[in-house]
């Protein structure tokens, strides 16, 4: 108060109050947990986070309650985001991050939610008892059933044309077939190399039963044989288990009805235990039966959801040679289903498949591992994950050495569709390696023309992908003397290879400004240059000194 008894205004007192409130709000915001720390069901910070088969992370208690209630909650009112609780893996990285955050902000670490509380939350989301609305596994299977003919047609044609491969020894390159289409290379193979429609000479399969013993009369006979197999599989006698598995293996080799009827939860639960059996004959026949069951589209989702993938990964890592063949074949067969691609990648199959492709003793294991990786990397998440696992240097090492080069090129073409893959490839000297491989392919003997054609197409497709969205490509291509090789491909290659080579050469001539003529005559119709299928969509306007270049590329 001043001399005159009047109050004086102090501006600093107001500023201090405002600063204090702002600091308080900032502190409150810092204590708000990140959204990824919250369980989508309980909406609270997770104390024991687990990753489910569909890739999401939940509180363990919430997953258990959902299983007990046989209920699949919707996430954000999105039908496509329905979680899959068939298998869980502890998310240790998330748990460690949450604990660190709690210690940093000075709050207590989260405790598991009460079971009854979670149950009450979920029951509020469940429809009334009199309303028959529930998303079940069978409904999910029916929802994708209409897509089956696309795969079945390829399977039928491929099996008829390549049946000899399953019963004879072929070169590694001959076993990889690429579709003759302008799209991304797609192997027509839909049957694992370990699968044979006729009785095999495998030591694990005893030829004591004729090929047409079962399902020859009626559906009632099928039911009777199902019961016989079930009773043998659940027997405590190893001999009975072996006989039951041999019967099952033979029944499911060619009979579609047998594959569907025997892919039941009670038989699959017994089969899962036998895959980890210490008796090699039991394990191998169980895996062979699973391969046969997985050939039916309806069974692919069921097998993954019942938790077979982690077991197959373990067998692929440390099983016998024949067991590894069947494990790789099953994973390949399961990966043909789009809804299985992400769960298989999340469950950790990519690294073991890559190792099997490089180092497996069996050619069949390497073959099916390559095709499994090819189909899994059609998924963007798996592509990025495989790049982070260091797959690019390993794959190009195989191309350079010539070991399973065509198989490695299939995966490389998919990885080139993502920016991480292209960057890693350029760092791994991919342009020089691919150009060198193209040079080698022109010197192959005529007997190897089929494999050379496939390898050339994949090399050119990979170079075509690298030529986009990369300022480094042109310099690297010139250094590798790619122009002369690409001109050779343009003149003598297959139709698909010629088209790609022509586009790469045009991109190299016209893409960089310093290569333009000073007077700039006319313009180029780039819509005619780029793929008619739209897999690479780029538009350029070239004219005069001022050239406008706009690009919107989405892979190849």
Curated annotation (Swiss-Prot):
Q: Segment Disordered: which positions?
A: 1-34
* InterPro entries given in the database record: ARM-like (IPR011989), ARM-type_fold (IPR016024), Armadillo (IPR000225), Ubox_domain (IPR003613), Znf_RING/FYVE/PHD (IPR013083)
* Keyword tags: Repeat, Transferase, Ubl conjugation pathway
Renumbered to this chain, the Low complexity biased-composition regions fall at 13-32
Is this entry keyworded tRNA processing?
Answer: no
Q: Give GO MF terms, alphabetically.
A: transmembrane receptor protein serine/threonine kinase binding; ubiquitin-protein transferase activity
Catalysed reaction(s)? S-ubiquitinyl-[E2 ubiquitin-conjugating enzyme]-L-cysteine + [acceptor protein]-L-lysine = [E2 ubiquitin-conjugating enzyme]-L-cysteine + N(6)-ubiquitinyl-[acceptor protein]-L-lysine
Q: How does it assemble?
A: Binds to SD16, SD17, SD18 and SD129.
- This protein's name: U-box domain-containing protein 38
- Highest classification ranks of the organism: Eukaryota, Viridiplantae, Streptophyta, Embryophyta, Tracheophyta
